[in-house]
Structure formats: structure tokens, C-alpha cells
Amino acid sequence: MNSSKTTPQRLAVSIVCSLAAGFCAASLYVTFRHGFNGEAMMTFSVFAFWYETPLYMGHATPVFYCGLAIVVSTSIVVLLSQLIISFRNHEHHGTARWAGFGEMRHAGYLQRYNRIKGPIFGKTCGPRWFGSYLTNGEQPHSLVVAPTRAGKGVGVVIPTLLTFKGSVIALDVKGELFELTSRARKAGGDAVFKFSPLDPERRTHCYNPVLDIAALPPERQFTETRRLAANLITAKGKGAEGFIDGARDLFVAGILTCIERGTPTIGAVYDLFAQPGEKYKLFAHLAEESRNKEAQRIFDNMAGNDTKILTSYTSVLGDGGLNLWADPLVKAATSRSDFSVYDLRRKRTCVYLCVSPNDLEVVAPLMRLLFQQVVSILQRSLPGKDERHEVLFLLDEFKHLGKLEAIETAITTIAGYKGRFMFIIQSLSALTGIYDDAGKQNFLSNTGVQVFMATADDETPTYISKAIGDYTFKARSTSYSQARMFDHNIQISDQGAPLLRPEQVRLLDDNNEIVLIKGHPPLKLRKVRYYSDRMLRRLFECQIGALPEPASLMLSEGVHRDGQDLSQQAAVTEAQGLGDIDSIPNNMEAATPQNSEMDDEQDSLPTGIDVPQGLIESDEVKEDAGGVVPDFGVSAEMAPAMIAQQQLLEQIIALQQRYGPASSHSVK
């Protein structure tokens, strides 16, 4: 069925036939060179030209040279005619064929181990041999489709993390990627971070998505905050569609207000809206307090609405993603940033987003926000001379994150900003369930390397068969006559058939995979298993030392107010009746003792995070700082946690110096 296998044989047969035709033509010339007569016809022989050759006569004659010219010219004409006819017939029904290893190696997709810089998708030979590995070549984005236990983790994800020369942001659903590859990444020079907000032992680094907005000029904060709100707050259910815009506006106003107060965290926004009392009174109070015109406008508009409408807005806001910050662990894990997105292209960084399968749906808003914010920051400016590293977004089981509109758009543009996507799903129907047909086609058309392992659904095998295409073959049919016993007719015709039928895709064995590469024929390769491959196993076993685990995150009293958890406080808020606006707690006053305690420890703590350029710490700012410290603290006995607390304090002081006093209600 593979036409590429018979091409050399057909070419050899064509050459032999053309030479034979040329030799016969030369024999005709030798026989009839004196004219056509009966005697010449009686003595004709196909070997007549042989008797005129120097091999037979011992010397060359003019007849030999003329005959030789006839052989060459006739052979060329016959050979070209055969090739033209063959190609015309071959292209009539399709030209599908399997790619050869040589042509893919020449195109740069098959590389030796010591030349691998990109992801690894497969291998040309078994695990014990020194074969070539399939990488992405010139294609920036890739798609891996494989069901459960098909080998996508051991064959693509882990080998890629062991060998990729660049920064990686990996969605680690089971936490095994961090355990299996983090030491290799660290040994390769990466700065390794583990972001696991719901880790049972609270071992997680922190990331605050609002700090990037707080560091921007005031005129850009509103636009970036709206983008943040669009990425985080999503409508849950049909009834929420009419209130989603208002809920996002509330979130925008809350972020801008918390930046003014010196508490640039989403947890502070949750606390702001979880205060007891009538919402219209709260919004009216915030409109008077805020100095940001956009925040004032939003709060004024909200304060003029009916209580039921305000309840709908806040309900959609909470259900859309903000209620996640009722969890003290999430609030603490997003109170500061241990890594900077701006360093991803500047130095090799590996960020593992670890979450258990049971918690993935819960923290999906936070993970979705992180991915989309990183994409947005990378596309703000083209890479500089010192930003030479590519950034790989490794999205395993990314369908659980929901619809990623920013990534759906960025897949067509982010390659110019050194961004690379690797999407991993179990079947193409997973894309159909989240994105419409246009969105699914957008992913399929922009992923230049598509790897398929044995699938059991109906959509994926059909797509593979159609994408590979048809080939042309010679079909022979024989018909017999009923009137005459031995009378039959044989017909040979060109017909087309799929190079790989859908049922053959389903029967693909466990050791092979099919790869579709844009602009090249399909490729059939062996799967890679890092634990048995002679090169990858050596790299994996060379990992030594302890895992680069972060210190346990300690929760302070700021997370529990008056012995009541904030998640419970949210429930109490709904049960509150009418409340006086004066009863709204001033978070800034509540934070004053914490600020004083932190100031006492400041001189003994080293400096951690870089303060944005142009922001200088001063004693006057410390004295006038009236902003609220986020509800996150540390144990005084643990030095790493104390350093993190000092980092947060420096950020707050720098932000307050830039934007002025946090509020007219600050405690003096």
C-alpha cells in the first residue's frame, strides 16, 4: 500500500526497459542502414548492434557510433515518457506516503541526543540503540493526543522536561513531574519553583498576579486590570451572562482600591467585598474613599442599584472565581511573588503548577489566570538582546482549565515573542467540548507537530485518516463471459484509498505513534520511554540530592480574624441584615499592629525581591504607611518565611511611596 517503497523498483525497471528499447532501435538501424528490402528483413536480429560493437569486432566503426547515439537518445525519450505517465497516474487519486527518516533528518526534525534543544516526541529505533529523536524543528507549537496510560507522560512530557533548553511553565496535575524532573532542571541551571496553593503540607512558592499591575503606571492600570478580570471572572450558568460585565467591573474597582490601600492582592479584594452590611452602603463608602476616577465611577454606579441587583453582581463575582480566595491557603499563596514573569526569557526558569486531580476544577480559575497573564506579559514587548530563552507552556490535561481565550488568540502570535505551546489532551473530542468548531480548528491549524497515540474515540481516528490522505494504486479486475467458458477480460485501472484507515489507527500497537508535521508527509515512529531509553535513563538516574521543595507556608492570625476563618466570614456576610456604614471595619487600622511588628523585625532581615526601578525605600514612608498588609504572615522562628514577609513589606512601602498615602482613613 505504500507507494514510496515501490518507487526505486519502478525506476530501475523503467531504466532497463528504456535501454532495451534503445538497443532494439540501434539493431534496426544496423539491419536496415542500406535500405528496406526482403533480404534485410529475413536477416534481422535484435543483436545486430552487438555485432558492430568494439567488444565483438575489436575496434569501433562509424556504424557503432551512430548506433550508440540511437541507444542513448531512444532510452532518454522512453524513460521520460514512462516517468511522465507514471506521475500523472500516481497523482490522479492521491500522493499520500510515509515520510522517510532521511528526509526528516535533513529537514531538522530528527536529531541526535546531543543536539536536542526542543521537546522530544519519539525515536527512530528501540530504546537500546543510538537512534535519532523527533523534535519540533521549525514548528513552535505542538499537540499530543493520547488516552490514559498510552505513554504521553513517560514518552513526551518527562523527556521534554529532562532535555528542553529554555524556561518551562508546566501544569503538573499529579505532582509527579516535579518529583521526577525538578532535580534535573535545577542541575541544568534552572531556577525551580513549585506553585501548589492547595498542597497538604503547604509547601508552595507564591505568586501574586496583582503585583504586576501595581508596578505599572497609573494610566495603564485600568486596562490591565480589566484584562485580569476578563481572564479570572467567568460566567457560570445561563443566568450569569447578564451580570458578568458588572461583576468584572466590581472586581476592577476592587483591585484599584486595594492598590491604593497598599494591599495589591486578590485576597484583599475578597476581604473588601466580604465585609458585613448593605452592599450599596459599602460601595458608597468606597466611592468616597477611592481617589481613582474609574473606581469611583464604578462604585457610584453600583451604589445606585437595588439590593437584589447588587446581590446578583456579587454572587456572579464570587461564583465566577473570586470565592476561591475564601480559602486561606490560596490567599496566602497569592500574597506575594517568589518569581518574576519578566525573567522567563532572561534566565532559565521552571515553574511547576502542582495540583491534585480532585482540586484541579477548584483552582482552575487561578491556574487559568496565571497562564493567561504570563502570555499577556510576554507579548507586551519583543525579546531583548538579553532575553534569549524560549518559554514552553506545557499544558497537560489543559481541558480542565476551561476555555483559555487569551491562549486561543496568542497561539497565532506568541511565537514571535519566544513563546511555545504544548497541548496534551486525551482525544480531539476534548477540544470540541470546550471550544466551538472554529476554536478547535484554530488549535489544529496552528500546532505544526501533532502526535497521536492509539485512540478509542471516533473523531480522532477519522481526523488522522483524512489528514494523512489517499494514495493511488493499480487495481486489476477480471470478468468472465457466460457464453464462452474460457473467454475472460482483464482490466487494470488507477484507484485511490486511504493510506491509513480509521480502524487501522485504533489498532495501532503500544510501541508506535503517528506524527503529523506541517508541510511534510506523515511519520510513523516508536514511542520513547524515559526509564528504558539508554540516553534518557542515564539523564534521569543522574539526579541526586533532595527535591527543591519550598518551605512550608505558615498561616498567621491575619487569615483568622477573631478566631473565625474568612471562609466562614463570607457565609456570615450573607446572613447579615442592615448594617450601619460606620460598622464597616477599617482594614487599615487592623493592619497597624502587624505593620509595627514587621517594622521592628525589618533591620534584622535581608532584602529579597527587587523593588521596581525608581522606587526608593525611606523612613518617612515607613512612618506614614497606612496601607493594609495582606492577610498573610509567617512564623518568627522560620527564617525563610521571615524573609518572605520582609519582601512583601518592601513592596508595600515602595508602592505607597509611588502612589502617595493609601487612604484618608489611615491611622496616624
From Swiss-Prot:
One of its GO terms (cellular component) is type IV secretion system complex. The keyword Methyltransferase does not apply. Gene3D superfamilies: P-loop containing nucleotide triphosphate hydrolases. This is Protein VirD4. SUPFAM superfamilies: P-loop containing nucleoside triphosphate hydrolases. Keywords: Cell membrane, Conjugation, Crown gall tumor, Membrane, Plasmid, Transmembrane, Transmembrane helix. It holds the Pfam family T4SS-DNA_transf. The keyword Cytoplasm does not apply. Belongs to the VirD4/TraG family. NCBIfam families: PRK13850.1. The gene is virD4. It is a multi-pass membrane protein. It is found in: Cell membrane. PANTHER family: CONJUGATIVE TRANSFER: DNA TRANSPORT (PTHR37937:SF1). The chain crosses the membrane at residues 12-32, 67-87, 153-173. Its main location: membrane. Residues 577-612 are annotated as: Disordered. One of its GO terms (biological process) is protein secretion by the type IV secretion system.
